[in-house]
Amino acid sequence: MLDKNTNLTHQSKIEFVNSNLRGIGFVNNTKIEVPYSLPGDVYNVTFFKKKRRKPSAKLELVSQTQRSFIPPCSAFTKCGGCCAQHISYQDQFRYKTSSLLESYKKDFEIVPTLYPAQKTFYYRNRMDFAVFPGPIVGQREAGSFRHIVDLETCLIQSKESNEELYRFRNLISKFPNLPYDRKSDSGFLKYFTLRKAKNTSELMTILTFVEEFKNTIEEKEFENVCLKSLKADHILFCFNRRKGEISATGEIKILKGMDSYKELVCGKEFRVPFDSFFQPNPEGFQPILDFIEKEIPDSFDHLVDLFCGSGFFSRIFAHKFLKITGIDSIESSLEIARKQMSLDFPKIDSSYLKVDLFSKHSSSKLKVLFSSSDKDVLIADPPRAGLGEFVLDALKDSKVSYFFYVSCNPTSQKSDLWKLKDFFQIQKILITDPYPQTPHLESVAFLKRKNFTT
C-alpha cells in the first residue's frame, strides 16, 4: 500500500525487465514500471494524485548501472517509437519471450519453438511521420501525442525510405507555411508516409493534407516541386478532415505511379493499396508462413480463413486446397481477395463473406460453417484482442480438424487457447520476433481437434 501522504519520496531499485521491456521496481508492495531502465538502476519515486485519477509517479534517476550497449539512435528515449535500443538484441528476445515460455510449460506442458529476428534494424516497410510547424518532421514524443521529435533518419525503416525522408526534409524546408499547425488551425500538410516493399524495389510516398488544400494554387506549385524532388515509384497526395489525426486515408490524387505498390511473399505478387494494412515486416514474418506450410496436413479439401483481410493466407496456401472460404468485416479488403483469388486460382471454389466476427449475429453463420466437414483446416489471424467470444463458442462445437492460430499478441492468444483446451490439443507453437526494439511478437499455434482421428 502507498503512504497516505502521496507527496513522500521513496527510493526504488530496478529488479528485473519485464516482457514489455520496462524495468520493474517496487515501493513497499507497489510495482513501478520504468521505461529505458535496467536491473540495478535506482530511482527516487514521488507519488502524486490528481482528482478522480489513479496515483501517478514522478521518477528521478539517482544512479544507473553501467551500460554495455550504446543506443545507435540519438533520438532514443525521446522518440516514442523504439523502447529497447539500450538492450542487446539477445537480451531483448529473452525478456520478451521468457514469461511466455514458462507459462506454456506450466499450463500446457509444451515448449514453444523460439525464432529470433535475423535483422534488428531497417526492417519496417511503413513509417508515418507527423509534420509540424518549423518545419518539424518526426515521430510522437514518448508519452505525448501533442509533441513530436524531429528525425533526420529512422533506424527501423529501410535505407531507401531514409533517403526519401532526407529529400522530403530538404523540400519542406522551403515551404515553412505548409505544415499544419494544430494550435492555430492553420497550414495544410499533416503527415508524410513512406511504404517500402521488402521483396521488390518499389517505394511509395504519401503526403496527407487537410481537405482545403485540394485544387489550390499552392497545391499545384507543391505538386510540381514534389515531382522534381522526390524519387519514389508512387507519389500520392491524400486529403482528409482538418481535425483528423489519421495518415494516408481519404480522397487521393496520384502524382506518379499507382495507388498501390507491389510486394512479393512466398513467390506470390501482392498489390498493397496505399491505405491498407500489410505485414510491417514480411521478411520477419516468413517463419510463420514456413511453419504453416510445413504443418498443413495433406488430403484436406477446405481452408477457412478467418479475419482474412485481403486474403493473405488464402492466396499463399490455396494450392493445397479445393475450396476456400474467407471471412472478414471490411468489404474493400474482401473485394481485393475475390479479385486476386479469381485471377490466381480460377479453378478453386472460393468465396469471401462479409461477417463481423465480434457480433453475436456471426454465431449462427460460424456454427454452420464449422460443422460442414471433417476435412476443414482453419487459419485465424485476429486483432490483438483475440478471437472473441463468438468465434470461441463456435469452435467448441465445431468439426474443424486442424487449426492454425496466428497472433500479434501471444498473451491474448494463450488466454484463448486455455479456453479451448478441452476441445483442441496444441501440437506445436512458434514464437518469432518481426519487431526488434519493441515489445511486440508474432506467434502461431498449431492445434488438432481432440476427438478427431485420421
Swiss-Prot record:
Q: Name one Pfam family in it.
A: tRNA_U5-meth_tr
Report the active site residues.
C408
- Residues at which S-adenosyl-L-methionine binds: Q279, F307, D328, D381
EC class of this enzyme?
A: transferase
> What are the annotated GO cellular component locations?
membrane
SUPFAM superfamilies recorded: S-adenosyl-L-methionine-dependent methyltransferases
Q: Name one GO molecular function term.
A: 4 iron, 4 sulfur cluster binding
Keywords of the record = 4Fe-4S, Iron, Iron-sulfur, Metal-binding, Methyltransferase, S-adenosyl-L-methionine, Transferase
Which residues does [4Fe-4S] cluster bind?
A: C73, C79, C82, C154
The biological processes this protein is annotated with in GO are: rRNA base methylation
- Record-listed E.C. numbers: 2.1.1.-
- Segments spanning the bilayer are none
What protein family is recorded? Answer: Belongs to the class I-like SAM-binding methyltransferase superfamily. RNA M5U methyltransferase family.
* Protein name listed in UniProt: Uncharacterized RNA methyltransferase LIC_11085
